Amino acid sequence: MKDIATPNRTKDIVEKYGFSFKKSLGQNFLIDTNVLNRIVDYAEIGPKGGAIEIGPGIGALTEQLAKRAKKVVAFEIDQRLLPILDETLAPYDNVTIINKDVLKANVHEVFQEQFEEGQDVMVVANLPYYVTTPILFKLLEEKLPVRGFVVMMQKEVGDRLAAKPGTKDYGSLSIAIQYYTEVETVMTVPRTVFVPQPNVDSSVIRLLKRPKPIVEVIDEKFFFEVVRASFAQRRKTLMNNLSNNLNDFPKDKELLERILTEIGIDPKRRGETLSIEEFAMLSNALVPHKMK
């Protein structure tokens, strides 16, 4: 049987079921088998491994994962795709489709039901553009026992994930993702290999979970509050941003300035110039003065 991800087969499937693409669900189907195979290559899933997919569409990536993994679990929010997936994935008995919004699903429960204890599992997905960040954060914050992620996303978002301090793309998203994972941009995917064609190119990003976060922080929740406050207005200094936007800290500019100076951070610097290590040092220095 021909692979799903060819222009003709995709067209035939879509026409057979009278399927109309929903822009609100960010539906863009990949029609290039080479790209799909490279994505699966980067995930390095062995014959005993597992994969979690989000938004399988008509099953193009699911099919390639099913050929290599022992078990594939895919979350699909759109009920209209279920009969299509029943047909396209019929040759594979190692795939389970879950008709749920992954953001509302109990992913831990699904994980325990579907995978063996200690099984090597990767999240591999062409993520819908409009929910890329919430999905990544949900799966990272819930500490799902996966090795990592190989995910396709809007190139602009991928650039932000991998950004270094002092660059225009560096922000709270870069820090949050790099706190939990090692980030690598493994390929760029042109918009021309999708149906319908999106307005922008995509990136495939590999995120490998760190055994423990890259920096040690006393209070993780407060660390992220400090990071978010520091980027609240990019043109403002660290001093201004923290004094105006850090809600859990006393409105005391002198105290703030003294702490910054003591740890060797110039209060006139901007948030985007600080490394993740400097943010950890800063939040740890501010914690004792935090309002309870």
Curated annotation (Swiss-Prot):
Positions of S-adenosyl-L-methionine binding: N28, L30, G55, E76, D101, N126
Pfam families in the cross-refs: RrnaAD (PF00398)
Swiss-Prot/TrEMBL catalytic activity: adenosine(1518)/adenosine(1519) in 16S rRNA + 4 S-adenosyl-L-methionine = N(6)-dimethyladenosine(1518)/N(6)-dimethyladenosine(1519) in 16S rRNA + 4 S-adenosyl-L-homocysteine + 4 H(+)
Stated name of the protein: Ribosomal RNA small subunit methyltransferase A
InterPro entries given in the database record: KsgA/Erm (IPR001737), rRNA_Ade_diMease-like_C (IPR023165), rRNA_Ade_Mease_Trfase_CS (IPR020596), rRNA_Ade_methylase_Trfase_N (IPR020598), rRNA_adenine_dimethylase (IPR011530), SAM-dependent_MTases_sf (IPR029063)
Organism: Bacillus cytotoxicus (strain DSM 22905 / CIP 110041 / 391-98 / NVH 391-98)
Gene Ontology MF annotations: 16S rRNA (adenine(1518)-N(6)/adenine(1519)-N(6))-dimethyltransferase activity; RNA binding
GO cellular component, one term: cytosol
Protein purpose: Specifically dimethylates two adjacent adenosines (A1518 and A1519) in the loop of a conserved hairpin near the 3'-end of 16S rRNA in the 30S particle. May play a critical role in biogenesis of 30S subunits.
Matching SMART domains: rADc
Name of the top EC class for this enzyme: transferase
Keywords (A to Z) from UniProt: Cytoplasm, Methyltransferase, RNA-binding, rRNA processing, S-adenosyl-L-methionine, Transferase
Superkingdom in the source lineage: Bacteria
Compartments, record wording: Cytoplasm
Annotated family: Belongs to the class I-like SAM-binding methyltransferase superfamily. rRNA adenine N(6)-methyltransferase family. RsmA subfamily.
Listed PROSITE patterns: RRNA_A_DIMETH, SAM_RNA_A_N6_MT
EC number: 2.1.1.182
